Amino acid sequence: MGKPFATYREWQPGSEYHGLSAERITLNEKTLWKGGPNTAKGAEYYWNVNKQSSGVLKEIRQAFLDGDSKKAGYLTQENFNGLGAYEEKDETPFRFGAFTTMGELYVETGLSEINMSNYRRILSLDSAMAVVQFYKDGIRYQRKYFISYPDSVMVMKFTADKGGKQNLVLSYCPNNEAKSHLEADGNDGLVYTGVLNNNGMKFAFRIKAIHKGGTLKAENDRIIVKDADEVVFLLTADTDYKMNFAPDFKDPKAYVGNDPSQTTLAMMDNALKKGYDELYRNHEADYTALFNRVRFEINPEIGTPNLPTYKRLASYKKGVPDYQLEQLYYQFGRYLLIASSRPGNMPANLQGLWHNNTDGPWRVDYHNNINIQMNYWPACPTNLSECTWPLIDFIRSLVKPGEKTAQAYFNARGWTASISANIFGFTAPLSSKSMAWNLNPTVGPWLATHIWEYYDYTRDTKFLKEIGYELIKSSAQFAVDHLWHKPDGTYTAAPSTSPEHGPVDEGVTFAHAVVREILLDAIQASKVLGTDAKERKQWENVLTKLVPYRIGRYGQLLEWSTDIDDPKDEHRHVNHLFGLHPGHTISPVTTPELAQAARVVLEHRGDGATGWSMGWKLNQWARLQDGNHAYKLYGNLLKNGTLDNLWDTHAPFQIDGNFGGTAGITEMLLQSHMGFIQLLPALPDAWANGSISGICAKGNFEVSISWKEGQLEKAIIHSKSGIPCNVRYGDKTLKFKTVKGKKYEITLKGDKLAVL
């Protein structure tokens, strides 16, 4: 891929605050982070580890053997955390850092709301363009915003249907945690350079204005436009951050790259040469090539209310059906992923990339105990596999630092991470002694399962051989080494916790489910490549001796090693159902008894909780193939976990729920995690008629499905790798060989599936 981030930065007018008198635009660049090795003299930064941790493992495990779980918990909380020096006294991470904003632009228009009418704000999912339009004194005004990924530029266009009506003043409000300098760049632009106080990270942006009619001048810190017919603003932005897959731990500048004042200049020169029309054509072609792959319709015979989205959502919350709102939410999730995760940049964080604070919620970091993983659940199934690349590169950047964490805490081979990560390879726990959330060593293997997922959907053997397999293998090595081989011959994860829930335990179900998943992935990957037969046997041996799933006193899947589950517990995390989703070791088809135990858990946990939690439960009910209950969760997500602009809310805004919702809808209509393609596995009664085209199944199949009166009408399966295809619809099955590039139509003929 070359040098990451040199050619493109994904920022958005993502937090636009529209008004007649002024437009306020928050600038977000995902590599603008506080923290990192520059704050800790290089090598010290990577040793945010309690170096005696692995030495205490034997004592902790002996305490479990002795039945003294209290002692085991105490020893764990005293030794399996990070160092307090990495956080300031107010508990705001210092060396860990936080995603921060570049500041805000203001475009003052001189207009008031007097005699204003027909004000509309539009986000077109078809073109990824934001539009503001209104009438003022009989004149139609319009403002357009888009970002061209191929050209690394943000574009804003101000027009009116009468000449000479653009009187604008563009100004900037800086990030107050940086030393900054803003000056005119010629007579038509501004150039800003900044340095974060915390770590010395450099950042810059440039603005150029192009006008028709009237006058334009740049002076000091403003661009002033008078009596113009039309104004186009171009903005380029960058930081000096450089992703590093093999950082030199002695170098405090391991993540420092090119001068952003120069990279933004090159971007701007390119944009100016092309002009507005070409920039828009490039943007539209690039975006639609991804977004238009999938089409989705629910009950198309029912019309769409002609109301603003927030009013439609309000009506939906009152129980008024709106199937087009449901399909809009689905496609909005795909739009958000395209906008926040493109090759050559960081992955989507807790808020995707949209935030307007110097210290956002949870530092707007990468939470590895479900949140970043949930962000990528819809990527491959909704035909956006390219959008997985930022996650893949992020995982690659964690490996070398993660090897230190694996060694320090478990004396293990391979690599792992902890609950929170930043863009500088931070893989250790934070300093908190609250082990319920701070101890989670299997999040590294959970991340690594996405590597196999990407391969399984794309069947890109070159990727698996050159990049993917080593990530999976080294993660599997950690998974094995961190386990406790007990005197009775079983393997268990001790110490471990069920993320954000409950005590330190000698083997929580979640940890075992993740280990089971990564070992199965490693076994399959080694077979595909015909390598590591000896190590594969070890993985297979550990799987046979890993503590199995267990069912508790009220029929529930156990969360911990003992039956302490509370049937009244409605906690938001449903960690012990990892094997149901996103894993694939529990299914009503292959393991019906375990699936029933998972159902009991979900029934007791309830149908509420945070937005992202409802998104997860939606996927789990879909995996249980209960379409009506999955639909209930989807409705709850929209009614109780969605803001007026369709962002997910925790509260506060957290983007993972959007992605979980989109993924869950796909799971309702198509599943392929059990070794076959299952059509309409969880179709709800409410969606009597509909169609979806362009979604993907494992094995590199692209699938389109239509249904009528709740029954399959037909499916089109496009085989992109030419492997055998195994299809299931209800209790009907069909197997057939395929040819690469050929499409196959599947229909019902009598009581059987047939291929045409």
Where does each model-flagged region fall?
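Active-site-proximal binding-pocket segments
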Residues: 346, 358, 367-376, 383-470, ...
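C-terminal capping/lid segments that line or modulate ligand- or cofactor-binding pockets
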Residues: 2-26, 95, 101, 366-387, ...
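Active-site neighborhood of glycoside hydrolase catalytic domains
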Residues: 443-447, 451-469, 473-475, 487-505, ...
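Solvent-exposed, charged/polar functional surfaces in cytosolic regulatory/catalytic domains
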Residues: 286, 290, 478, 521
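Aromatic-residue-lined binding/catalytic grooves and analogous aromatic/hydrophobic interfacial grooves
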Residues: 1-435, 453, 473, 486, ...
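A generic, residue-level signal for flexible/boundary positions that often mark functional hotspots
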Residues: 217, 348, 457, 673, ...
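Residue-level signal for beta-strand positions within conserved beta-sheet cores that form or flank
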Residues: 166, 489, 675
